[in-house]
């Protein structure tokens, strides 16, 4: 399947490598274009660790290219970038084209659903309680070190009538690791990433300021 990934950080690179290694065709989009510049010039995407992959991936020049002619769209940005990604994709999303939000925060799916309704577009919005994997992007601009691939990921779909379809798509793309939850509120409550990362960040600020290499697990 051809999958548009809106984002170009560690999670987006890791997901692209995961999908490509599984035989799918990811299309990465960097809103600024900076993080995909070398990939757009033909350098291979390389993943090491829990996901092993090296090869070329498609790069979209804008939001329209990232969404056009793909079987599904994945939002793989920090939560403060979700609205920008939604707005970039909105004019180009087609009825029935699934959108996966990895991971879901602040009921962004409701915003996307309401904006799509203004266009008369109905599609499944699939939200995750966390990301598929964890990792760190490397300074070379084309590599990612994948630390873990999660065994379980909570998932819910809007509208609820499309829940079975949403879970089936996720399993087809990413394997049998998804646990269906009742709805957006359950996903919001199960998403522990914001508060967990806040605590880690507060006690490691100087490491980040100095650009040190440090692992979250051993510095909690």
What residue ranges belong to the model's regions?
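NAD(P)+-binding Rossmann beta1-loop-alpha1 motif at the extreme N-terminus of oxidoreductases
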Residues: 1-48
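Short acidic low-complexity segments
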Residues: 52-70
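Rossmann-like NAD(P)(H) cofactor-binding subdomain of soluble oxidoreductases
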Residues: 74-75, 79-140
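Internal, well-ordered alpha/beta segment that forms a basic, Gly-enriched binding/recognition surface
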Residues: 117, 127-175
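Active-site-lining helix/loop region of Rossmann-like oxidoreductase modules
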Residues: 152-220
